[in-house]
Each structure stands twice: as C-alpha cells, then as structure tokens.
C-alpha cells in the first residue's frame, strides 16, 4: 500500500531529478520503500548510503554563496583492505563534484576529509556586512568600551569618602583606582590571545560577566582589603573590551572607514573616565552614598553582557569559518568537515610562544610599537593624573563642593569631541592616500592629526597650570583649557592606535594588547603622586613639569611621518605593503 510522499521526499526527488538530467550516465533508478522512484548515482552500497545523507542535506540546506569545500587527501576508514577496494573513476568523481546536488560532499568509495572555506567576498565575512549590521555591532562595542572606561575612574571621588569609613589615608584610598588600572594592565595578556584563538565575542562576554560580578562585590565590600581585591579583578575583566574592540572594528572596516570607527572607540575610552567622576561625585554626596557608584557600574556591565550575547555578531573571520564548519558537521553528521585553522595542533608551548608572549615581544623588540605606545601611554596617564589635579584646582583653591568640583571635566570632554571631529574630517584625505598606493594601508598617512595634537596637548597643560595656580583667576579660564588638552589627548592617542593597527594589521589584537598593558601601568602610577606633586610644587610648576615633558615628545609624530616606512621595513613583525 503506497503512502503519500512527504514534503522532504518531494524536495529530494526534485533536486535529484535535476541532477540526473545533468549527468544521466552517473545515475540509475532504485525503488524507495514508499514506491517512489529516485535517481541515485551508480556507486557501491556504502557510497550510496553516504550519498543519501549528503543528498538530503543538499536539498534541505543548499550551500550558500561564498561557501565551499576543498577536497583533501582521502583517508581510508579501513587501510588494511585498501587494495581490495575498487577505485572510483576520477572523471565520474569530478562530474559529481561539479553537480549542484553533490557539491556538498563528493561521492567516493571511502570517506574523505574536506576543508570548509568561505570566499573573501562572502557576506559572512565581517568586512562585507551591510552597513546597518556594521553600525549595530559598532554601537554595541562602543557601549561596552564606555562601560569599561567608566568604571576606571568612577571611584576617584568616593576614594576620598572612604577614608573616613575605613579609617585609611588618602594615598591608600587612591589605590582603589590604581589597582583597577593594574587589572587593566594584566588582562590583555589573556584576552588578546583568546580573541585570536576563539574570536572576538567570547572574551567580551567573559569580560562583562566578571566585570559585573566583581563590581557588585566592591559595592557590598565590608573592608578595604575586599574592595581592593575586587577592584583589581573588575579591572582585569574590564580590560577585555579595551583589548578586543579595536581589533573587532579592524575586522569590520576597510581603510576607508576604519579610522572613523576607531575614532568612536577612542572617544568612548576617554569619555568614560571624564563622565564617571561627575556621576560619582553627585552620587557620593546624595543619600545613595558611594556604594551606588559600583552598583550602577555593575548594572551597566550586565546590560552590556546581555546585548552582546543577543545582538552582537562575531567579527573574526577565522572564528566565523570555524563556526560554519561546526554547523555543517552537526547538520550532516560528517565529522571530516573542518576549517583549515582546525588542522593546527597547539601545545601549551605553541600557545605561549605564538599568542601569550606576542604582546610582550611586540612591546620590547619592536621600536615602532614601543615608541608609539610610550607616547600614547603618557597622554593617557596624564588624563588620570588630571582627575586628581582638577579637585585641587577647583575644589581646594576655589572651594567648589563635591560633584560641582568635577564639572570642569566637561571642558576636557568637549575637547575630546572636537578632536574626534577633526579626525573624522581628515579621513577622506587618508583614504585618497590609500587609493594612491593601490588601496593598501598607509600607516604614516595617519599621523598629520597627531602633528596637530602634539602642539595642542602641552599648550593646554601650560594653560591649565598657570591659570589654575592663581585662585583669583575666574574658574572659567582654567576650565576652558580642557578644550586644548582634551583635543590634543584624543588626536595623539587615536592616531597612535590607528598607526599600530595599520602597521601590525595581522597582529592588531596583540599590538593593542601591548599598548593597553603599558598605558594602564602608567595610568595606575600617575594618580599616586599627583596630589603630593601639586601640593608640594604648586599647581603652576607641577603642571609645567608635565608640559615640558609633553613638549619634548613633540618630534615623535614627525620622526615616524618621515622615517616610519624605513623603520617598518627593518621590522620582523610590521607589515610593509
């Protein structure tokens, strides 16, 4: 008694019929249990069985654009009987491979290994995504970076409040910011290699989960030891997005738009530390108290975890290909399908040599990475030093109350936005330079905005120092210095990051990790001596000392602009297109 064919059987029959019409010499008719006739290849029983699974997969899950399998050397399931097997006709096998039905798995006597690959122009690759998808992912990643940087200085104002709660000195209380930044310093050693092994998304998810948990722990901490320890681990997990986000943006954007995307990331890196002291000051002064600075930070982290998990896509091409190969294995049950990168057999020694130690190797053996990182680290550390200097200038000298004393940070914030605008306006010029050399990145063409910033940065510091030194000078004057200082900091830091990405394009995550390690170490130390330096030397001369150092670093972008290409040619790890 015959039964009505199912929709799956009809789809399979239709697909096979089309294939049989294309290659009738390879097929013969067999009867199915439901008395429906099917055209199957003229192969052995075992091959026909293997084909059945492949055919059903091809009918239900056709290969999408840009996906393909590359045939490797056959691996016999029973090598001892290899000589007794009938070898398939190579011409027939080639026809089967070309057949739309059999393009998923070539049908041969023995199982084979297949390398799953994706065409570089496939829409699966992040750089080929539609603009809306890129914009969505970029906004999510920017928010994650903002959460991380927000937490770094949100404890700057509460640090003074906890001196009376836990009966500690001001210097000890300032360690709450230092240990967080030391966590920043240690985290990239783990997150950068992990992002190159497993993709960009897993480190961010793990980082935001740990970030939220340890910020809650700080909020409920009963003693200073608990707070210090939890702040360190919060910084360790918070360093994940700072290490990975820039590399993820490099995955998504070509030379034309990468600089604009990195501008958004850099703005978030600086906006967080400038906004959080204002929030922290008013929260600490309110009935909520200093603990709510950490509650709010943890809520931000958990929200970031949710939106990254639900809406953020993986951007690393190697991880995307591995994920698709895993999906095909699960659907077809053929565990010979794999990505090329999965053929690598990594030992602990290989992981340490090729991944864990790469950031340190870049930092201490590559002059480009070391000098560029040194400059960006100095301006980044000055930002955290100013978080301690502003309360002296506006709180102690001008008697602003808590919260209000932090409002002049808005000047720095506006300066950061001005610097971002300058960089975005510069991007078309950079893109034309890239087109002039065949569309390849030109790291030295990134540096003209830094040449502007290297003058604005020391000018802003001198402006703040001597206008802030005299209490009779209206507070607006030193507050406006933040326009020059913030703009200079952003232009220098941003182009340093862009230069590292372009110069070490295939090691971008490791280069950013090296940068994060050094700049976090310097930022951790600067606030510890800021208060004593500004008290003992006076605001004018303490600031001038920093201004003189910034002035001495002015030649840095000019040296790399004129000699950077020659230096890169001598490098073992930098790219030279």
Swiss-Prot record:
GO terms for biological process: spermidine transmembrane transport; spermine transmembrane transport; transmembrane transport. Disulfide bonds: none annotated. It is found in: Endoplasmic reticulum; Membrane. Residues 1-24, 68-93 are annotated as: Disordered. CDD domains: MFS_Tpo1_MDR_like. The chain crosses the membrane at residues 139-159, 174-194, 204-224, 232-252, 262-282, 292-312, 367-387, 402-422, 447-467, 473-493, 504-526, 543-563. Keywords: Endoplasmic reticulum, Membrane, Transmembrane, Transmembrane helix, Transport. It holds the Pfam family MFS_1. GO terms for cellular component: endoplasmic reticulum; plasma membrane. GO terms for molecular function: spermidine transmembrane transporter activity; spermine transmembrane transporter activity; transmembrane transporter activity. Belongs to the major facilitator superfamily. CAR1 family. This is Uncharacterized transporter C36.02c. It comes from Schizosaccharomyces pombe (strain 972 / ATCC 24843) (Fission yeast). The lineage of its organism: Eukaryota, Fungi, Dikarya, Ascomycota, Taphrinomycotina.
């Amino acid at each position: 008694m015959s039964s009505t064919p199912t929709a799956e059987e009809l789809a399979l029959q239709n697909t096979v019929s089309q294939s049989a019409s294309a290659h009738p010499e390879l097929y013969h008719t067999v009867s199915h249990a439901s008395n429906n006739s099917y055209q199957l290849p003229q192969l052995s029983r075992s091959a026909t069985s293997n084909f059945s699974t492949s055919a059903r997969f091809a009918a239900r899950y056709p290969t999408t654009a840009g996906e393909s399998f590359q045939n490797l050397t056959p691996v016999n399931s029973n090598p001892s009987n290899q000589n007794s097997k009938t070898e398939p006709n190579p011409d027939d096998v080639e026809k089967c491979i070309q057949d739309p039905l059999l393009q998923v798995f070539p049908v041969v006597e023995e199982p084979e290994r297949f390398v799953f690959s994706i065409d570089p122009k496939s829409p699966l690759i992040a750089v080929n995504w539609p603009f809306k998808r890129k914009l969505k992912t970029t906004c999510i990643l920017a928010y994650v970076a903002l959460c991380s940087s927000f937490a770094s200085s949100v404890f700057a104002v509460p640090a003074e409040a906890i001196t009376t709660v836990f009966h500690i000195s001001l210097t000890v209380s300032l360690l709450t910011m230092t240990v967080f930044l030391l966590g920043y310093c240690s985290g990239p050693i783990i997150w950068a290699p992990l992002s190159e092994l497993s993709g960009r998304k897993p480190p961010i998810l793990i980082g935001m989960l740990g970030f939220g948990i340890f910020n809650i722990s700080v909020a409920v901490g009963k003693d200073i030891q608990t707070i210090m320890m939890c702040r360190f681990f919060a910084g360790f997990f918070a360093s994940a997005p700072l290490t990975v986000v820039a590399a993820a943006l490099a995955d998504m954007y070509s030379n034309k738009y990468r600089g604009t995307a990195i501008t958004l990331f850099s703005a978030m890196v600086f906006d967080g530390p400038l906004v959080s002291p204002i929030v922290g000051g008013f929260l600490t002064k309110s009935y909520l108290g200093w603990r709510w600075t950490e509650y709010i930070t943890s809520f931000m982290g958990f929200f970031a975890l949710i939106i990254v998990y639900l809406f953020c896509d993986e951007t690393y091409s190697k991880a995307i290909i591995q994920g698709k190969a895993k999906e095909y294995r699960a659907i077809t049950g053929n565990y010979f399908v794999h990505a090329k990168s999965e053929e690598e057999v990594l030992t602990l020694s290989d992981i340490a040599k090729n991944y864990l130690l790469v950031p340190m190797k870049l930092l201490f053996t590559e002059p480009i990475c070391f000098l560029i990182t040194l400059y960006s680290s100095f301006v980044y550390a000055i930002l955290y030093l100013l978080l301690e200097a502003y309360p002296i200038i506006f709180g102690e000298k001008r008697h602003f109350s808590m919260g209000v004393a932090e409002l002049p940070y808005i000047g720095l914030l506006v300066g950061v936005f001005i610097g971002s605008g300058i960089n975005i306006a510069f991007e078309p010029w950079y893109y034309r330079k890239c087109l002039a050399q065949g569309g390849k990145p030109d790291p030295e063409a990134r540096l003209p905005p830094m040449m502007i910033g290297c003058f604005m940065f020391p000018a802003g510091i001198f402006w703040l120092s001597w206008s802030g030194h005299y209490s009779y000078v209206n507070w607006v004057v030193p507050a406006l210095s933040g326009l020059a200082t913030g703009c200079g900091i952003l232009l220098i830091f941003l182009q340093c990051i862009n230069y590292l990405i372009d110069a070490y394009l295939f090691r971008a995550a490791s280069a950013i990790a090296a940068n994060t390690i050094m700049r976090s170490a310097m930022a951790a130390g600067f606030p510890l001596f800021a208060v004593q330096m500004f008290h003992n030397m006076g605001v004018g001369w303490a600031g001038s000392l920093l201004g003189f150092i910034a002035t001495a670093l002015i030649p840095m972008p000019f040296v790399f602009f004129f000699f950077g290409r020659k230096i890169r040619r001598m490098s073992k790890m930098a790219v030279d297109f």
